[in-house]
Swiss-Prot record:
CDD domains: RNR_II_monomer. Its EC number is 1.17.4.2. It is an enzyme of class 1 (oxidoreductase). The keyword Disulfide bond applies. Keywords: Cobalamin, Cobalt, Disulfide bond, DNA replication, Oxidoreductase, Redox-active center. Belongs to the class II ribonucleoside-triphosphate reductase family. The keyword Cell division does not apply. This is Probable adenosylcobalamin-dependent ribonucleoside-triphosphate reductase. Monomer. The lineage of its organism: Bacteria, Pseudomonadati, Campylobacterota, Epsilonproteobacteria, Nautiliales. It holds the Pfam family Ribonuc_red_lgC. It catalyses: a 2'-deoxyribonucleoside 5'-triphosphate + [thioredoxin]-disulfide + H2O = a ribonucleoside 5'-triphosphate + [thioredoxin]-dithiol. GO terms for biological process: DNA replication.
């Protein structure tokens, strides 16, 4: 049991939260997103409503801090904690700021109290020098919901095992059993370990409920496929059919595919390579590597530019970016030397999380929180929300994970990422000068609050405290543009796929919401929702240079970690040579960069489709009222991590 001392809101505070009006930002789309992704089943079999989730999260985060204080015999003022918790919960209820999706799903659950904090974290990364250990750790983190970054550092040392006399390993019906089986199989190649065949008989059948973690069991089939694939990849490597880079990335992509195809968790990865590695540069070229099309999409791929000496690689990199938007670029010198631009903050990190907002050491995790700056009425309002978001992020890492190698690094760095979303909306609404002022003073506020909380807890202050995350699903709840990005359109249709057997789909259909058969997945329906962004300009009206200037402004004024970005460009205006000059000009001032060519591709049931104002207004009047109190027994689908504009899949 990781938590023994619990914090409970009094009945009058809970009643206040249950009876206080609130409004999701995009109306019915936001409501459906909440119930699809974050509404857990309560003990009585009904689904959480938004106030229930707010209460669970509030009691969970305050339980972590209370538990830490009492376990270490530190001061704890219950009366003051209750006062602050009430304000904290009310601001969250109104969607002024939010925890990350992992926090909405896992905070305050029995799984967290019994198993520790790993399921609360967004960001993870691992060095692959020890291939078997790295693969085990990565699968472990993917299965609890973190996005994982990995490099290609493995030495390549391996030998074929003796398959004639295998040992039998009976896989336990648990996450631990799955990840151990993967480690044992890889070790039979890399560590001269015994070769294993696996007994899957203990694994519960597909469709069984996962009562503690939440969700539905996938059965043994995804793991069986993964074991066969791992064996094939390592055999192909030793038979010289693929090289070391392919071996590492193929292994990790297939681990991610197992997690996704099993519907265990929505996984996301980033593969991190060297700019001179030609195999790595062409991993997304499915004409060159056609077999990778099945699983190559699992990871974003980025190359590490260590310093100015590596800038000669940029021409080759941008020639690839010009066609498909990959690879991304990480600037190692800036990651390790600076906090915000120009501020010296030594950092050992050499890896990144999948969306590029947090630089990480191997086996490190980082948790986030998010303020919707465009929803603030003034600077004082923004400063108050910083207190809540910083409290949340600074408290999660007081609770250990189940991994000792991870706890060691978290205890040293205490790295957090307080993020802002709706940045583009706020610039249009308040003006750039005002937002720069808010962010500059806001950063100092985050630091002040974090230092106070660290002192109270008797721990080091956080190495770094701010970032800008991409905010796909969470920004939909609040109704803002995601992260630093401009919306794809001011008026749009947002489509969501929901499984036909889902009780959520049945409720929507029974309520009168129109739907279509999914032409790509016979087991799903597609629902379309009209939305309006509070921004007069869409991304099509914002040039690449203006986007880059917003990125560098955020790295200078706010983010001492990194700024997740997908910078879109018109390929008819900017060729590879133009992109090379842009990257060389801006990269010395930033830490991560993703460039994506705009494509006018139109296809049926697009996730996001621009519409006219008149169509928006017509469709809004056709939306039904859904009686959410009738929803029960729906198993939420948890969030999809790959949520930047370049890779959102619903």
């Amino acid at each position: 049991m990781y938590v023994e001392h619990f914090f409970k809101l009094p009945s009058q505070t809970k009643e206040l939260l249950q009876n206080t009006p609130y409004r999701f930002g995009f109306g019915l789309l936001s409501e459906v997103t909440f119930y699809r992704s974050y509404s857990r089943l309560k003990e009585d079999g009904t689904n959480e409503h938004w106030p229930d989730t707010v209460i669970r999260v509030t009691e969970g985060i305050f339980s972590i801090r209370k538990n830490h204080a009492l376990n270490y015999h530190l001061p704890w003022d219950e009366e003051q904690a209750q006062i602050f918790a009430k304000e904290f919960a009310l601001s969250m209820l109104q969607l002024r700021w939010l925890p990350p999706g992992r926090g909405l799903w896992m905070m305050g659950t029995r799984y967290m109290y019994e198993r520790g904090s790993a399921g609360l974290y967004n960001c993870a990364a691992v060095d692959t020098s020890n291939l078997a250990h790295a693969a085990e750790w990565a699968m472990d983190m993917l299965m609890v919901g973190a996005g994982v970054g990995f490099n290609t550092a493995w030495s390549g040392k391996a030998t074929k095992p003796d398959k004639k006399h295998p040992k039998i390993y009976v896989i336990d019906d648990s996450k631990e059993g799955w990840v151990k089986s993967v480690r044992l199989l890889i070790q039979s190649y890399t560590d001269n370990g015994p070769f294993y065949r696996f007994d899957y008989s203990k694994i519960r059948p597909a469709g069984s409920p996962l009562k503690t973690f939440g969700g539905i069991a996938p059965g043994p089939e995804p793991l069986k496929r993964l074991h066969k694939k791992i064996e094939q990849i390592l055999d192909d490597y030793l038979d010289k059919k693929i090289d070391k880079t392919r071996c590492v990335v193929d292994l990790f992509n297939n681990i991610g595919l197992c997690v996704v195809s099993g519907n265990i968790r929505r996984s996301a990865e980033i593969a991190i390579g060297r700019p001179g590695d030609k195999t790595f540069l062409h991993l997304k070229d499915y004409e060159k590597f056609p077999e990778r099309k099945e699983y190559g999409w699992i990871s974003n791929n980025s190359v590490v530019i260590e310093n100015l000496d590596d800038f000669h690689y940029i021409d080759a990199i941008t020639s690839l970016i010009a066609s498909n938007g990959e690879p991304g670029v990480l600037h190692l010198e800036n990651m390790q030397k600076y906090g915000r631009f120009g501020e010296i903050v030594p950092d050992r990190a050499w890896l990144s999380n999948p969306c590029g907002e947090i630089a990480l050491e191997s086996y490190e995790l980082c948790n986030l929180s998010e303020i919707f700056i465009s929803k603030c009425s003034n600077e004082e309002d923004f400063q108050k929300l910083i207190e809540y978001a910083t409290f949340y992020a600074s408290t999660v890492n007081l609770l250990p994970t189940h991994r000792p190698e991870t706890n060691e690094i978290i205890a040293r760095n205490r790295r957090i990422g307080v993020s802002v979303s709706g940045v583009a909306d706020a610039i249009e609404k308040f003006g750039l000068e005002t937002i720069i002022k808010w962010l500059r003073k806001g950063y100092e506020k985050v630091r002040t609050v974090n230092e106070r909380l660290a002192k109270e807890a008797g721990i080091p202050v956080s190495l770094k405290v701010t970032c800008v995350k991409p905010s796909g699903t969470i920004s939909i709840l609040a109704g803002t543009s995601p992260g630093m990005h401009y919306p794809l359109a001011t008026y749009a249709l947002r489509r969501i796929r929901i499984g036909k057997t889902s009780k959520l789909a049945k409720l929507l259909i029974d309520s009168g919401l129109s739907f279509e058969e999914d032409i790509y997945d016979k087991n799903s329906y597609v629902f379309a929702f009209p939305i309006h962004y509070d921004n007069p300009r869409s991304i099509k009206e914002v040039d690449i240079y203006e986007q880059m200037l917003v990125l560098t402004m955020l790295q200078r004024e706010w983010a001492d970690n990194m700024v997740s970005n997908t910078i879109q460009f018109d390929p008819t205006r900017y060729d590879a040579k133009d992109l090379s000059q842009i990257v060389k000009h801006f990269l010395p001032m930033i830490k991560s960069l993703t460039l994506l060519p705009e494509k006018e591709t139109i296809y049926p049931q697009m996730p996001f489709e621009s519409i006219k104002k008149e169509e928006f207004e017509k469709r809004v009047t056709q939306l039904p009222k859904v009686e959410w109190n009738t929803l029960s027994g729906h198993h939420a689908d948890s969030e999809r991590f790959c949520s930047t504009q370049s890779c959102q899949i619903d």
